[in-house]
Amino acid sequence: MAKKSLIQREKKRQKLEQKYHLIRRSSKKEISKVRSLSDKWEIYGKLQSPPRNSAPTRLHRRCFSTGRPRANYRDFGLSGHILREMVHACLLPGATRSSW
């Protein structure tokens, strides 16, 4: 189980990303429209002004049950070992174990 502080930190990052999403998107559109290099550098400065944790690359997917940030399956929202346990216990409908 992940520490609760790490899970809360991730939630805070998600809120920040949603808050500054429109600002980042509008700045990137402006950069593509502007031709002069000096204006582009000015807009790049604006793009760096939001907090670093508001960048979408800082977000991690976490397992719903354990909060683990690695080996997550997008379809289920679970980490690999929890997914395997749930499939073996027949708790996920439609998921079958592979055998060959």
From Swiss-Prot:
The UniProt entry lists the main location of this chain as: plastid
Give a Gene Ontology cellular component term annotated to this protein.
ribonucleoprotein complex
Q: Which family does it belong to?
A: Belongs to the universal ribosomal protein uS14 family.
Location comes to: Plastid, Chloroplast
Q: What is this protein called?
A: Small ribosomal subunit protein uS14c
Report the GO molecular function annotations: rRNA binding; structural constituent of ribosome
**Matching SUPFAM superfamilies:** Glucocorticoid receptor-like (DNA-binding domain)
Q: What does this protein do?
A: Binds 16S rRNA, required for the assembly of 30S particles.
One Pfam family, short name: Ribosomal_S14
Q: State the organism named in the record.
A: Lactuca sativa
Query: Organism's domain of life?
Result: Eukaryota
Q: How does it assemble?
A: Part of the 30S ribosomal subunit.
Q: Which InterPro entries match?
A: Ribosomal_uS14, Ribosomal_uS14_bac/plastid, Ribosomal_uS14_CS
Give the GO biological process terms: translation
Entry-linked HAMAP family: Ribosomal_uS14_1
Keyword list, A-Z: Chloroplast, Plastid, Ribonucleoprotein, Ribosomal protein, RNA-binding, rRNA-binding
